[in-house]
Amino acid sequence: MNITVYHASCAEVKNPSVDVNGENLGFGKGFYLTNSKAEAEAWARKIAAENGKDANPIISVYEFNYFKTKNVGYRFNEFETYNKEWLNFVVDCRKGKDVTADYDIVIAGGLDNEIADIVEDYENNNITAEEAVEQLRYNDVKFQICILNQEIIDFNLEFVEQLTM
């Protein structure tokens, strides 16, 4: 069974690579996707705004064979909710710690501006982990997928189309 997923950018990405996105992101260095078209649109607008007036928000659409990927034996790290384990994982990734080496793919709640602010407050010791988790529980989990293993992209992710906004 395939799942439609989206990648936000300023360019069409027909041949994705795990080396595209930087190392100190929420789930480390990898290729980031979401299963929410609305989230992808919001991210594409943000990325385009950060890249100047000539940048156009673009969404690349893919079909991802989640169940085949899961059943073949790739190593998944999945968080269904925002919790203390998720919080510490994200903080470690943002600090550049190599916490993703044991995984091929991470699926978890992503970091929009509000979530990122809470994580930063925790990182800066302005709030405790318990306070952060309490604040996070009021937010809907907007799932993000970070593929860390190029083989998953090459054999389980198929480009469908580009959407220019």
Regions found by a protein language model. Give the residues of each.
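Short aromatic-glycine-(Arg/Gly/Cys) micro-motifs in beta-strand/loop hairpins
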Residues: 1-26
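Conserved NAD+-utilizing ADP-ribose enzyme module
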Residues: 2, 25-26, 41-42, 46-165
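Short, well-ordered alpha-helical microsegments
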Residues: 15, 40-41
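A short, exposed loop/beta-hairpin motif centered on an aromatic-Gly-Thr core
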Residues: 27-32
